[in-house]
Design a protein with these regions (language model features):
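Helix-biased detector of long, well-ordered alpha-helical tracts
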Residues: 1-346
Length: 346
């Protein structure tokens, strides 16, 4: 980066999915809305799922989602690629295949055209990798840059994966390490090592396509991508939507080492506090240290898939996932709901 270039992250108050409106506030904002009832709407926003799904025919359903955010990287190309990876992930989480996308962009009038071009190029290249066609979009002027995609995909109506189908006995798998939100806070302060910055960028630009392709071969009952609401926020949505509770083996969680160091120092994104406020009443932390809890509330950007799979298929799916996503781990299990707390940290 040239010395006279403005760091993109300095133009944003929040980074990536850390800019999301809190889940509790969002629920209040959407409450009482008049929504048209349609029997072909297979998935709406009533259970806070990753995307909407609309049945078109007996063997075809549309999957639609939208995601955009302010810069999470100073390199404009990397920012564009991360934003596209994150937006496409919602379709993969539903078991679908993304096919079409539209750009959503806001840029300062003073931003060099070369910078804007690089943001778009990052998005286009990642969409190309995913087999997705970007057919247009919409752009506005704004003091804070933002970029993302509205994505349309397809899935068989009988093979839709939601966040509300987890069953007691299911094994919970997860595909990516945790700590991206903490790292991006540290990156804004220039206190993250170069190798860890590269690791973060690599994780955030890794499509969930391979994980999706693996999981649809097995008896997966529920899936969600873990992004802005953090691991515990998204798992809470799964537990509540499925009417179950989740026991999380914290020793199995793959925390990024430098994120652990920063969390212990108190380098935390604002989104972590919003996520904690939303999910904490439903979480039994046991005797786990505060830094570990903070990381489990940490907002992830382009995070991995949390997969609730039939126990008979768990080992085979985990082995296949590790063949394409080496960081895949067995995080815990789903239990019958006994009332009270929804998530227990073991």
């Amino acid at each position: 980066m040239a010395e006279n270039e403005v760091k993109l992250t300095k133009l944003a108050k929040c980074a990536g999915c850390g800019a999301k409106v809190g889940a509790g506030v969002l629920a209040q904002l959407l409450g009482g809305m008049k929504v048209l009832q349609d029997p072909n709407l297979l998935v709406g926003f009533d259970k806070s799922d990753d995307a909407s799904v609309y049945k078109v025919s007996e063997d075809l359903a549309l999957v639609q989602t939208v995601d955009f955010f302010p810069p999470i990287a100073d390199d404009p190309y990397v920012f564009g690629a991360i934003a596209a990876t994150n937006a496409l992930s919602d379709v993969y989480a539903m078991g679908g295949e993304p096919k079409l996308a539209l750009n959503i962009m806001a840029v300062p009038e003073s931003m060099p055209k070369e910078t804007v071009h690089e943001i778009l190029r990052g998005g286009y290249d990642k969409a190309y990798e995913a087999g997705v066609i970007i057919t247009g979009g919409h752009s506005i002027l704004d003091d804070e840059p933002k970029y993302g995609l509205a994505v349309t995909g397809f899935v068989h109506p009988d093979r839709v994966l939601t966040n509300s189908g987890a069953r007691p006995g299911d094994v919970l798998l997860f595909t990516k390490p945790i700590g991206i939100g903490v790292l991006t806070s540290g990156m804004k302060a220039d206190i993250v090592s170069a190798p860890t910055v590269e690791l973060a960028y690599r994780l955030m630009t890794t499509l969930n396509k391979s994980a999706r392709d693996a999981m649809v071969k097995y008896r997966v009952h529920a899936c969600t991508d873990v992004t802005g609401f953090g691991p515990l926020g998204h798992l809470l949505e799964m537990a509540q939507g499925s009417g179950v509770e989740i026991r999380l083996d914290t020793a199995a969680v793959d925390f990024i080492p430098e994120a652990v160091e920063l969390a212990k120092m108190g380098v935390l994104p604002a989104g972590m506090y919003r996520n904690r406020s939303f999910a904490e009443p439903w979480v039994d932390p046991g005797d786990k240290p505060v830094w570990l809890q903070d990381l489990l509330y940490d907002p992830q950007t382009a995070g991995g898939l949390a997969i609730a799979v039939d126990p008979a298929d768990a080992e085979a799916l985990l082995a296949e996932l590790r063949g394409v996503v080496p960081s895949a781990q067995r995080w815990g299990e789903v239990r019958p709901y006994r009332g009270g707390k929804r998530i227990f940290l073991d």
